[in-house]
Swiss-Prot record:
An annotated GO BP: translation
UniProt KW Chloroplast keyword: yes
Location(s), subcellular: Plastid, Chloroplast
InterPro entries tied to this protein: Ribosomal_uL22, Ribosomal_uL22_bac/chlpt-type, Ribosomal_uL22_bac/org-type, Ribosomal_uL22_CS, Ribosomal_uL22_sf
Keyword list, A-Z: Chloroplast, Plastid, Ribonucleoprotein, Ribosomal protein, RNA-binding, rRNA-binding
The protein, known as: Large ribosomal subunit protein uL22c
Gene3D superfamilies named among the record's database cross-references: Ribosomal protein L22/L17
Gene: rpl22
Family: Belongs to the universal ribosomal protein uL22 family.
A Pfam family reported for this protein in Swiss-Prot or TrEMBL: Ribosomal_L22
Organism encoding this protein: Oenothera parviflora
Keyword set includes Iron-sulfur: no
């Protein structure tokens, strides 16, 4: 399946983060759709352990936007944020009398996508100009 090329979007991907997916989703649901600056404030104040790796990913995505695409951080918005389950690390905990109990350490993959809102305004202006020219051609033929 071919991926659709999107303009004005930058992402950061964190794989095999040692945390269960539902715990990470609890934080991700709070930041989805918010601006970059508002997200930084929210993540700094939330009391969850998942905030630290998510904050690193948001900063990494913003650095990608600044360096690779020359976007302004003030116009960035978190357009997509998703958490997928990763592999589960399985270990054995030794117990008394030669027994052992299994320990499962869940991991997750987090993807943060930032979108530049100034690009959307430019795109709307561009397509509105295109549409007007198209309508003029139709009117002249009639």
């Amino acid at each position: 399946m071919k991926k659709k090329k999107t303009y004005g979007e930058v992402y950061a991907l964190g794989q095999y983060i040692s945390m269960s997916a539902p715990k990470a989703r609890r934080v991700i649901d709070q930041i989805r759709g918010r601006s970059y600056e508002e997200t930084l404030m929210l993540l700094a104040l939330m009391p969850y352990r998942a905030c630290d790796p998510i904050l690193k990913l948001v900063n990494s995505a913003a650095a990608n936007a600044r360096h690779n695409m020359s976007f302004n951080e003030a116009t960035l918005v978190i357009s997509k944020a998703e958490v997928n389950e990763g592999t589960t690390v399985k270990k054995l905990k030794p117990r008394a009398r030669g027994r052992s109990y299994p320990i499962r350490r869940p991991t997750c993959h987090i993807r943060i996508v930032l979108q530049d809102t100034s690009f959307d305004e430019f795109e709307e202006d561009f397509f509105s100009l295109k549409k007007d020219a198209w309508e003029k051609k139709i009117r002249t033929k009639i």
